[in-house]
Swiss-Prot record:
The active site is at 111 (nucleophile), 228 (charge relay system), 296 (charge relay system). GO terms for biological process: proteolysis. Gene3D superfamilies: Class I glutamine amidotransferase-like, LD-carboxypeptidase A C-terminal domain-like. The lineage of its organism: Bacteria, Bacillati, Bacillota, Bacilli, Bacillales. CDD domains: Peptidase_S66_mccF_like (cd07062). Keywords: Carboxypeptidase, Hydrolase, Protease, Serine protease. Belongs to the peptidase S66 family. This is Putative carboxypeptidase YocD. GO terms for cellular component: cytosol. GO terms for molecular function: carboxypeptidase activity; serine-type peptidase activity. It comes from the Bacteria. Pfam families: Peptidase_S66, Peptidase_S66C. Its EC number is 3.4.16.-.
């Protein structure tokens, strides 16, 4: 099930299912709102988005209320999460999935929002989106690529190919917008060759793993698995988190793996990724592409969780298409 695509003049509701909006500077809030308005949308803020407790979040009741209010408001056409965090999985048993299913909306975010995106897809069949947060749109430089693929996925029905960005960044742009550091992007790296087509699931690896053994973990039959993690995940952590997924009985149905670019502080090189994959006989024969524009570096593409993805990795070159989103 796909929600209606965004059109100019539509309302986007900003909700904080994990970290509170209050940690953003006023300048960042204004910049992000202005960027979305420049794209032609109206921006409204959820009632409790700025609530903040000792966990830099708000109560479960407040966050569930805001998500329900956004989904059930007929004027709202899309929901953007403020940013990630650690606790959106607290909300899963309190969401009214049947009612969400009757009021499908675009839901977009990444990192900790992976729990919501995959759970809602699994419980309702509604395709959700691993893509920019509201806070991402506060970026003054280097936002064009992220905007382009957000619109391709959320404002159009047309199939599209995800091309690599010309450059990428891993700086703390939210602390210094003027002195950005960008690197040339060498593009995706083929770890294992092959062709695959399937339903896209996943997102942030350590957050996806929180859903294991629950009713919220997505079905893996005929799927392409998207995984990425932040600077706190070194190769040892990423290795064991991936191995945990591989041990799932249904993992054998996964047709391919896409791995997002690692942050520099993780110290994970492509050679380490290749060496890690070589240890996993369970992955033999499926295409694997690493260093794609997904995750905690910028820019990022938007990926439909529950949509249809097609990949080709042949002779050291790769292509990624999003056919249904």
């Amino acid at each position: 099930m796909y929600a209606s695509k965004l059109k100019k003049g539509d309302e986007i509701r900003i909700v904080s299912p994990a970290t509170s909006m209050s940690i953003l500077s006023n300048e960042a809030k204004i910049q992000a709102k202005t960027a979305l308005e420049r794209l032609g949308y109206r921006v409204t803020i959820a009632e409790h988005a700025n609530e903040c407790n000792e966990f830099d979040s708000s109560s479960i009741e407040s966050r569930v209320h805001d998500l329900h209010a956004a989904f059930f408001d007929p004027g709202v056409k899309a929901i953007l999460t403020t940013l990630g965090g650690f606790n959106s999985n607290q909300l899963l048993r309190y969401l009214d999935y049947e009612k969400i299913k009757r009021h499908p909306k675009i839901l977009c975010g990444y990192s900790d929002i992976t729990a919501l995106c995959n759970a809602i897809y699994q419980k309702t069949g509604l395709v959700t989106y691993s893509g920019p947060h509201f806070s991402t749109f506060a970026m003054k430089k280097g936002l064009d690529y992220t905007e382009e693929y957000f619109l391709s996925c959320c404002a159009s029905d047309d199939p599209f190919e995800i091309h690599p960005s010309s450059e990428w960044s891993d700086d703390r742009w939210f602390l210094d917008q003027e002195n950005r550091r960008f690197y040339p992007n060498n593009g995706p790296v083929v770890i294992q060759e092959g062709y695959a087509e399937g339903t896209l699931i996943g997102g942030n690896l350590c957050t996806l793993n929180l859903l294991q053994g629950t009713e919220y973990f997505p079905e893996t039959e005929h799927t392409i698995l998207l995984i990425e993690d932040d600077y706190m995940s070194d190769i040892h952590m990423f290795d064991r988190d991936l191995q945990s997924l591989i041990h799932l009985p249904a993992f054998s149905h996964v047709k391919a793996i896409l791995i997002g670019r690692f942050q520099k502080a993780s110290n994970v090189s492509i050679d380490l990724v290749k060496a890690m994959i070589e240890t996993k006989k369970e992955l033999s024969g499926i295409p694997i592409i690493a260093n794609i524009n997904a995750g905690h570096t910028s820019p990022i593409a938007t990926f439909p969780i529950g949509g249809t993805c097609r990949i080709e990795a042949i002779s050291g070159t790769s292509r990624i298409w999003i056919d249904k989103h």
